């Protein structure tokens, strides 16, 4: 069982996009029973709020629903619950480390690193470009899936 937690600042744009894109990839491969996939925020700013309309709209364009998702915050105990804690950018990693304190098992990484790329997933909250964010999230999620399953 692979347990993956995607993390961004507010859990309304990038990390829920990654959560639901990864769930879609896994479901289409017939492997949903082999994965636990979730997302959360490092901040408290959006806790309880639904996914941003731009993310919701982009996911709907590709046939993915995220209707019931609400923002939640990362907790220190999440470190023990998940095998992979996947951040969208370096600031997320700094804030993850502030919450979990240490990463002795090497669980924390950047999403794009799983696609053999360096850099961050741009935050569409600031850029307004949900298409570019989706493209990069999809690349990262496909890379992570291949890395874990060999498919």
Where do the language-model regions lie?
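Conserved active-site segments centered on acidic
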Residues: 1-81, 146-150
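Phosphate-binding/catalytic loops
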Residues: 78, 84, 90-151
